[in-house]
Structures are given as C-alpha cells and as structure tokens.
C-alpha cells in the first residue's frame, strides 16, 4: 500500500518550525521522507528539533533565522541550497505579535515590527525562493496566515492586518507563478496553543 504523502527526495524549508504548527509540519514532512530545514530565531530550539527529527529517522538541518531581517532570510536560503541543492517546498510559518490591544493605541515601532516580520519577511523569502523553484521545474509554497486576517479583532488587529496581507500575497504569487508549475496557497488556522 502506498503512502498518501510521499515526499522522498523533496526539500522543505519551514520557518518558525521549533514549536506549534511549524514544528508539527516539519515532523510530518520529515516522516513523509522530506529533507527539512528547521528555522526560528533561537539556535538551541532549532538544534533540538533537528536532532529529534534525525533521531526519528528523518533528515534535517538547523538554520536559525530572524524572518524580520532580510540578510538572515538570504542566508537561510543560501544555507539550504548549500546543504541540499534545491528547495521544493517553502512553508512561511514564522510570525510575531508583540503587542495586544487596539490598533489605535499601537506605536509606529510596533506596527513596523509586526508588518516587517510577518508580511515583508514573507515577501522577501518568497521572492528569493520562487526563482529557485522555477529553475527546478516547480514547487509548492504554503503561507500560514490566520483567521485573524479574515475578521476584525480589538486585541490582535494589527497582527490580523499582517496576516491578511500574507493571504493577499499568496493569491498574487499563485497567479504569477502558477503557470510555471509553482503552487502557492495560504492557510488560515484559528487559535493554537
């Protein structure tokens, strides 16, 4: 009987993959045979998840990265390509929400941090990875948005705006890159512990 998801020979780069949704995605993709790149800001959790995947029989590398910093993102892609030679799957999962409360009370600095990390970081990473996928004949991009991007919220409104921007980015990239055999989707999960 064949496996439903066989990712043998595929390389998956997953941001924010040391806990929660990102970690679960990395573990499942590794179990399906993908070579996975574990990434988040802090090196130690990256290493721990990477080693756990290897102990379970998977193949993984750890590349710490702050997705709000363009140089970090370029390095993440460069190290992935150096290790595995290609990127078949990109999961943009990393995000930040340092402030809770009404958008009207948000400082410019907090707005910039949320938008730079969540929306601009995803934009930068996709623009770096998509041409690499095109060189290899195609690929898949999954942008983890949020239900907060689909409805207003007085507590996490700016986070929601950033996630709505990610969903819109996914729609645009799907139109631009779909004819080149690159599928781009956005998923909008609800609250996760």
Regions inferred by a protein language model and the residue ranges of each:
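Conserved glycine-rich cofactor-binding loop
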Residues: 11, 18-19
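Active-site helix of classical SDR
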Residues: 126, 162-165, 170
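Substrate-binding pocket helix/loop in short-chain dehydrogenase/reductase
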Residues: 101-103, 107-112
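Conserved glycine-rich Rossmann-like NAD(P)H-binding loop of the short-chain dehydrogenase/reductase
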Residues: 34-49
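Active-site loop-to-helix junction immediately N-terminal to the catalytic Tyr of the SDR YXXXK motif
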Residues: 2, 106, 152-160, 172
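Residue(s) in the substrate-gating loop at a strand-loop-helix junction
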Residues: 146
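Alpha-helical segment proximal to the catalytic Tyr-Lys
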Residues: 131, 175-179
């Amino acid at each position: 009987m064949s496996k439903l998801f066989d990712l043998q020979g595929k390389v998956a780069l997953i941001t924010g993959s040391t806990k929660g949704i990102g970690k679960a995605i990395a573990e499942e993709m590794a179990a399906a045979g993908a070579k996975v790149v574990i990434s988040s800001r802090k090196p130690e959790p990256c290493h721990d998840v990477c080693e756990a995947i290897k102990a379970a029989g998977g193949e993984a590398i750890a590349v710490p990265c702050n997705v709000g910093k363009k140089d970090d993102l370029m390095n993440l892609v460069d190290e992935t390509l150096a290790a595995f030679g290609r990127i078949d799957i990109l999961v943009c999962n990393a995000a930040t929400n340092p402030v809770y409360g009404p958008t009207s009370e948000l400082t410019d600095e907090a707005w910039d941090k949320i938008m730079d990390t969540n929306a601009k970081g995803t934009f930068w990473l996709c623009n770096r990875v998509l041409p690499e996928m095109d060189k290899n004949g195609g690929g898949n991009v999954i942008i983890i948005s949020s239900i907060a991007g689909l409805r207003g919220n007085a507590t996490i409104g700016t986070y929601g705006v950033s996630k709505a921007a990610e969903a819109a980015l996914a729609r645009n990239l799907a139109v631009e890159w779909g004819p080149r055999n690159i599928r781009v989707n956005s998923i909008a999960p609800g609250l996760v512990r």
